[in-house]
Amino acid sequence: MTNDEAHTARMGQRTLNVGFIALTAAIGGLLLGFDATVISGVVPFIREYFALNGAGGDLRLGWAVSSLGWGALAGNAFAGVLSDRLGRRKVLLCAATLFVLSASLASLATTLTAFVAARIVGGLAVGAAILIAPVYIAEIAPAQRRGGLVSLNQLMIVIGISASFFSNYFLLDVGEHNWRWMLGVQVFPALLYLLLLSLIPESPRWLVLKGRDPAALEVLTRVYGAEQAQASLQQIRQSLAARKLAHGWRALFDRRIRFVMLIALALAFFQQITGINAIFYYLPTIFAQAGGGVSDAFRQAVIVGLVNVVMTVVAIWLIDRLGRKPLLAIGVAGMAVSLLTIAWAFSVAPHDPALVGVAPANARLVLIAIIGFVASFAISLGPVMWVLLAEIFPNEYRGVAISAAGFWNALVSASVTFVFPWELSTLGAAGVFLVYGLFASAALLFVLLFVRETKGRTLEELEGELLSRPKSTAA
């Protein structure tokens, strides 16, 4: 008996609730959202503690902030392949362990090197969780609920983001070690994640890929019921019957997935090049640039976090009703308008390279436009991109292909957040947000021309439709 079959047997005959399974997997999203954006509150304090002012200070600060992203690159590079070999659940267990380790070490760091190393460890967990959690959910969810359940992962990410803004705000006045508490509090939800992962099964599609059909049928039966389980198992078998399991990175060069691979890479690029993580990671700094005190900047970050949560809930409600492509088009258009508005608001204010208040009269417009940008992102590129990535690739390519797209996504994110302090002090906020707005405009054009609708179709049905470039992209 394999470890996965033994785990399935230990779970007994109780019925498994697919909502509970998806929610458990999505806690990884909460942890990565918290871990990624908690740095926004830490920035002002580590800048002073690690003496990141003066010559080269902006780039060293960028390195400290983006180190999580560089770690995520390694997590992205290996998570998909490891999940194809070891299983989706085992990779999520590893990610949970790394979240605990990273939070502990970062909160105790006394040097910049130790801090960066701890954040890189957290990046490994982020890179794994952001890829494998939605894949796992997509592979266990019924087709009619898949979009909403996969989007649950994005909801947990934004709840984690909002929780980090709340946590930072409430820990702001605990004393000189407030930034250590901001980082260390994540240990508790990470330990809970480890516990809950022991209660859920392995992905049935992965079990079939490994020839473990009885274990897959056991999981499908307790999730879907006996009748639907047999039909689902047959669909999975048929999708794999005539194909050899793809191994390693060479699978990415298969001509059959070239078109969907290009779509995935483009969406991953646009999600980050439009500046979402730069905004989240430096949100109090941006609000301070628009005018206002430290406490006000942290309070405004909380407001943005709440808007992010609310609009992600709206996206989850709409994604299986309105569809993936309409949400993308509407949201990306809103992102472009909001970013260009932010650029204009800063353009009429005097530029201050020292990152101090510049134009209190524009602070309200900047806040409104950032809220508009985050709301638009939350109904489009935030959740919808990951849903599409979990849907458009064939079973035997899914792990490695999503890993490649995630690696590219993390590379762009890390690069954007690394250079942001330097850009802000060199180009000014107006120039930075103008560039982001132009990229968002290009993203809108791409969505309208190339993205296909996947709503309501099983993963196996989508394979035949998307393996080669479609004649029309209007659907």
Predicted stretch roles:
Residues 229-240:
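Short, well-structured alpha-helical segments
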